[in-house]
Amino acid sequence: MDGNRRVRFNTDRRPYLSPLQTSFPSSTSFQTPTFLIEEDDEDTEDDDGPQVLPVHRAPSPAAFRKRGSITSMDQYLVNMPAVPSPTASKVGLLDARNTDVESYAASYKTQSSSNSVNSLPMRRPTLDRSYSAPMIAAKNLQSDPEKMSNVESTNELPSTTTEAYKLVAAHTAARLEHMRLNALKAANDEGEDVKDNEQDDNIDESDPFANPKASYRGGVLSNLLKLYTNSNTVTSSRISLKHTDPTKWQKHAKRTASSNSLTDLLHASNQTFMAPASGLQSTEEIPQFSKTGHSRGRKFNFHHHSRKNSGLNEEYKITIHLADILQRQKYILKLCRALMVYGAPSHRLEEHMASAAKVLEIEGQFLYIPGCMIVSFGDVNTHTSDMHIVRVNQTIDLGRLKLVHDIYKAVLHDRMGVEEAIRGLDEIFKSPPYFRTWILVVFYGFASATILPMSFQGGWIDLPIAFILGCLVGILQHYIAPRSTMYNSLFEVTGSIITSFLSRAFGSIRYSGGRRFCFSALAEGAIVLILPGYIVLCGSLELQSKNIVAGGVRMFYAIIYSLFLSFGISIGAALYGWMDHNATDSTSCPVSTQMDDKWKILFVPLFTLCLLIVNQARPSQWPVSIFISCAGYVVNYFTAKHFGSNPIANAIGSFAIGCLGNIYSRLGRGVAFAAVLPAIFVQVPSGLAAQGGISSGIEVATSLTNNTYNTSSSSTLDVNSLKFGLVMVQIAIGISVGLFASALVVYPFGKRRSGLFSF
């Protein structure tokens, strides 16, 4: 500030609040300061004299506690004491000023403590981590501006609304620095017309290149930038100076800049301490400096200007719009996590998420890789993006997957709001599994027992042993593997080693000159629920749908996973062969112990039921899944009898399964994926046993224990060790071709609004 100017405060006793303007009596009369700018006698020629410095006052906190429309808030506005500029600290009147502010705070605290609703008023945050006046808390804020008339004083806000309010409040406080810089720039530009600048800042709405896409909402950044770039909010940074002679402006540029600096500091300090009225302050135009005579010692009081609530309404609109965008993005992320966790078809995940984002008018890009989804929310107004990574451990839960799909469809067809959908997804996440762990372990045993007759040529005598081995695998997977991260990485290998060792031990038991149990059937049936059939199937489907990254990664992992199982079978069988030289080396079951084909069809619904329970399917999903599974098995059985080629039989069987599932989804409004998946699991063990995938590991183990592994047979054994993985790939390719063909038949043009929730 100039050395030739002095700021003096004049304190006139004035009542701060009247009983008509507030709901509580004010026992203290506060002093409202007025400023007197004095100048020395050095510059007497062409002196502009003292100038009025306006101070924008914030409304009383009692006004925000009133119920009623926002548009009628003018009647509650009161004159709050203006906070002096920091440049006036040398005057020595700040102590008296602070005393008045403390008195007002004490009276407000007394009234707040008497009110049970407003006992702890929230504070308005700023970018410098400080807090200013009490924050306006609104309950049940909705996206419709007309429904915002009931402004309540409560601290319980939705998470997205609170986050949006904090963002708007912080950037409103940060706008003070933006205003100060614009004011200094306007003061330093000689002869610049401010009105022309305001016209240049306005965007031509008729320009098609200036407007973003109408089908998408703006992002978070574009809504926050409205606080800076909107013409209604930046007018306070434009200062209109009343000077007609440019030479006089240049002559007194130093003194004018000093006055402008004082004005900006007063305005900034007033907004900092009275932050709730920042929306009102931003809509006012700083008045022109009045030019008076050279009379020294004249006092000038602050003018009382009528407040406009358009800025406050604009801030409310930005806050609500920002909260709505954050809530929609939160729903999309939660939906993505739920679909991945509960086992949605991975090759259609990107399509599902794109459909959900399009309906919600959110611009989003999605990239799926196994176990991870990269989500990018774009902003068409600012050409920026907000990236999120959703990383989960994918499992299969058919029951909760159906619930997630119901929420997904309800939001797509406007039968459910986003807020209700988020609550529904949270409840699904928090809900316990439908079946307890010990029930899953028991049905692991039943699944191993029921798969033997129809896929691995097992007999009635083999069923109890298969049940014991299956329960052992279930205990390893559900009780031991989750407790140890190190063991979880070796679960497949150790499980196949233990079951293969015990299977050969039971198969070596002699009875009446022959073998009592079938070694190959027990070894294959024990690990049926940990076969990588679903992994290979998803990989082949992703490759067929041109998702090369996810399909290639998953297919390679499935092959390595298959080699792990084959290696475990070989090690387990070889260990028992090393201990017992009379161990069995048969890779097939005797014909005398095998069941008749007419009995095998009875085990298909039993095995399907075990799969449904293991995969947490609800009882309402059982009948359709069992019917589709039986139909697929019948088609596969007779096709294999006719063609003699197992890949062709798998393709035709999966085609029948896919057609039935998609028809059920189209007519019955069900989830085709949940109905089809157990039927696909029935196809995998049959094809694997028909092509001798598991028996290759048994052959390697037999060669090792009998010391027949030499240089001449090394190439044959190496091929056999890879046969398990290659057989799994062949089966998956046949099944994926049939499933894609079935989707093309039932949905020749796809689904227009939502993605196809099937294979």
Curated annotation (Swiss-Prot):
UniProt KW Endoplasmic reticulum keyword: yes
Region (Disordered): which ranges? 1-31, 188-211
Q: Name one GO molecular function term.
A: amino acid transmembrane transporter activity
Q: Which domain of life is it from?
A: Eukaryota
Topology of this chain in the membrane: Multi-pass membrane protein
Q: Name one Pfam family in it.
A: ThrE
Q: Family assignment?
A: Belongs to the ThrE exporter (TC 2.A.79) family.
Protein name as annotated: Uncharacterized protein C7D4.12c
State the species of origin: Schizosaccharomyces pombe (strain 972 / ATCC 24843) (Fission yeast)
